[in-house]
Amino acid sequence: GLVFYRYSGAQWDMLGMMFFNRELIVETWPILLGGLENTLLIFICSAVLSVTIAPIIAIIRTLNNPIFNCAIDAFVDVFRSLPILVLVIFIYYALPFLEINSTPFAAGVCGLFLSALAFMIEYFRAGIESVSRGHVEAARSLGLGVIQTMRFVILPLAIRVVLPPLTGHLVGLLKATA
């Protein structure tokens, strides 16, 4: 440490002035708050969209329809394997060739939404499939319909399984917006 301090060529006496300069902080504070606002808006938009649409697609995925399953599997495989940055750049620069113009904000939200949606579909599908058949059969024997069984029995039990990975992914999504 001392060798680095002595021979690095850094101006260590300027360190305090560079990092704790009140005038510099006052100048850059509005810029930082604007970036924080954009980060939170992109995160909230993409998180709300993906958390509301993922359970619906996961329920469709568990219906065992071969056409839907093939389409959903292809979507999940493609968008889980693409890096978020590549996806956002592709949306922003490739869609104008299809005469679909978007703002950088919309491209960011769309890219993060598609990436998060692919992961969250799998989280919700795994949560739904983790509910034991005994619970489903008990609900059906009590006279609950398919939709009522899904709403009152399967989804509340699946949320317990889904919540930890979903929370972790939302934290990662917030970090990815920056």
List each model region and its residues.
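Transmembrane alpha-helices and adjacent helix-loop boundaries
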Residues: 1-178
